Amino acid sequence: MSDFDSNPFADPDLNNPFKDPSVTQVTRNVPPGLDEYNPFSDSRTPPPGGVKMPNVPNTQPAIMKPTEEHPAYTQIAKEHALAQAELLKRQEELERKAAELDRREREMQNLSQHGRKNNWPPLPSNFPVGPCFYQDFSVDIPVEFQKTVKLMYYLWMFHAVTLFLNIFGCLAWFCVDSARAVDFGLSILWFLLFTPCSFVCWYRPLYGAFRSDSSFRFFVFFFVYICQFAVHVLQAAGFHNWGNCGWISSLTGLNQNIPVGIMMIIIAALFTASAVISLVMFKKVHGLYRTTGASFEKAQQEFATGVMSNKTVQTAAANAASTAASSAAQNAFKGNQI
């Protein structure tokens, strides 16, 4: 009956103990169960039952980003490797030099026992004339000078071949112009003259200078080689009636016959190359000469020592002295008689 006596317009939850604000606040903070989970509710609501979601593994490949600065141990390892490589290189160089010195020492011992046998020019054994010089770069020339001496030897050979080709160039020019007989004859003379003279007058002094560190032979080489360079320049110029297929003669021959002119131009280019290479090698040899400690005073001393130790000079001096003494004695004896 009490329900009928209540006010129909009153709040029905007024007397409900479960609608009390303190109770509803506590029940609201409790996470809903699985049956009450609403997927469309606020995303900030934690998963039902307080279940922790498993971590999703990262499917991207693991890539290490290179660092700009290497670790300290890497730098130390690199420096150690470089130092070890440098030591190995020096050791190999020292072993190579030691082997070269041992080989030269053995060869010198063999030469001292059996004597030096001339081996240049390399002529056949049945040839009526034998070799005139002994030449062995590995035995006579120090290692640091062998390359330079070999280049000078190749330069001499190059000039000899150019002189030989010059004969054929002048012969071809003589075939198209009979007035060039003088050039053809002189070309043969230059080949027969300059080939042996250049070998004896400047190459052998250079070879001996580096072999025995002789200042006097260096000065002989410089004097003769300057003259040789002047000859190269004149041959490259090619004046008429000089026996050279230089540029002047080549242009004249080109006007007369094109094939002959082309042949002469090639020879003129070879003469020019000889002149240029000669100048370059002269500067190189002069630079090496300054590093050897040679000087003009040493050259004078070597010349005086060589002259005084020469048996021919000693014999001539003794004969001159005896002749002067005998003539002086005779003059004195005649003066006493008078």
UniProtKB/Swiss-Prot annotation:
<dbReference type="InterPro" id="IPR007273">
    <property type="entry name" value="SCAMP"/>
</dbReference>
<feature type="transmembrane region" description="Helical">
    <location>
        <begin position="156"/>
        <end position="176"/>
    </location>
</feature>
<keyword id="KW-0813">Transport</keyword>
<keyword id="KW-0967">Endosome</keyword>
<protein>
    <recommendedName>
        <fullName>Secretory carrier-associated membrane protein 1</fullName>
    </recommendedName>
</protein>
<dbReference type="GO" id="GO:0006887">
    <property type="term" value="P:exocytosis"/>
</dbReference>
<dbReference type="GO" id="GO:0032588">
    <property type="term" value="C:trans-Golgi network membrane"/>
</dbReference>
<dbReference type="GO" id="GO:0019904">
    <property type="term" value="F:protein domain specific binding"/>
</dbReference>
<dbReference type="GO" id="GO:0030672">
    <property type="term" value="C:synaptic vesicle membrane"/>
</dbReference>
<feature type="topological domain" description="Lumenal">
    <location>
        <begin position="240"/>
        <end position="261"/>
    </location>
</feature>
<dbReference type="GO" id="GO:0030136">
    <property type="term" value="C:clathrin-coated vesicle"/>
</dbReference>
<feature type="topological domain" description="Lumenal">
    <location>
        <begin position="177"/>
        <end position="181"/>
    </location>
</feature>
<dbReference type="GO" id="GO:0015031">
    <property type="term" value="P:protein transport"/>
</dbReference>
<dbReference type="GO" id="GO:0035579">
    <property type="term" value="C:specific granule membrane"/>
</dbReference>
<feature type="topological domain" description="Cytoplasmic">
    <location>
        <begin position="2"/>
        <end position="155"/>
    </location>
</feature>
<dbReference type="GO" id="GO:0005802">
    <property type="term" value="C:trans-Golgi network"/>
</dbReference>
<keyword id="KW-0472">Membrane</keyword>
<dbReference type="GO" id="GO:0005886">
    <property type="term" value="C:plasma membrane"/>
</dbReference>
<feature type="region of interest" description="Disordered">
    <location>
        <begin position="1"/>
        <end position="64"/>
    </location>
</feature>
<comment type="subunit">
    <text>Interacts with SYNRG and ITSN1. Interacts with SLC9A7.</text>
</comment>
<dbReference type="GO" id="GO:0055038">
    <property type="term" value="C:recycling endosome membrane"/>
</dbReference>
<feature type="modified residue" description="Phosphothreonine">
    <location>
        <position position="45"/>
    </location>
</feature>
<dbReference type="GO" id="GO:0006892">
    <property type="term" value="P:post-Golgi vesicle-mediated transport"/>
</dbReference>
<keyword id="KW-0597">Phosphoprotein</keyword>
<feature type="modified residue" description="N-acetylserine">
    <location>
        <position position="2"/>
    </location>
</feature>
<comment type="similarity">
    <text>Belongs to the SCAMP family.</text>
</comment>
<dbReference type="GO" id="GO:0006897">
    <property type="term" value="P:endocytosis"/>
</dbReference>
<keyword id="KW-1133">Transmembrane helix</keyword>
<dbReference type="Pfam" id="PF04144">
    <property type="entry name" value="SCAMP"/>
</dbReference>
<feature type="transmembrane region" description="Helical">
    <location>
        <begin position="219"/>
        <end position="239"/>
    </location>
</feature>
<keyword id="KW-0333">Golgi apparatus</keyword>
<feature type="topological domain" description="Cytoplasmic">
    <location>
        <begin position="203"/>
        <end position="218"/>
    </location>
</feature>
<keyword id="KW-0653">Protein transport</keyword>
<keyword id="KW-0812">Transmembrane</keyword>
<dbReference type="GO" id="GO:0051649">
    <property type="term" value="P:establishment of localization in cell"/>
</dbReference>
<feature type="transmembrane region" description="Helical">
    <location>
        <begin position="182"/>
        <end position="202"/>
    </location>
</feature>
<dbReference type="GO" id="GO:0016020">
    <property type="term" value="C:membrane"/>
</dbReference>
<feature type="topological domain" description="Cytoplasmic">
    <location>
        <begin position="283"/>
        <end position="338"/>
    </location>
</feature>
<feature type="modified residue" description="Phosphoserine">
    <location>
        <position position="2"/>
    </location>
</feature>
<keyword id="KW-0007">Acetylation</keyword>
<dbReference type="GO" id="GO:0042589">
    <property type="term" value="C:zymogen granule membrane"/>
</dbReference>
<feature type="transmembrane region" description="Helical">
    <location>
        <begin position="262"/>
        <end position="282"/>
    </location>
</feature>
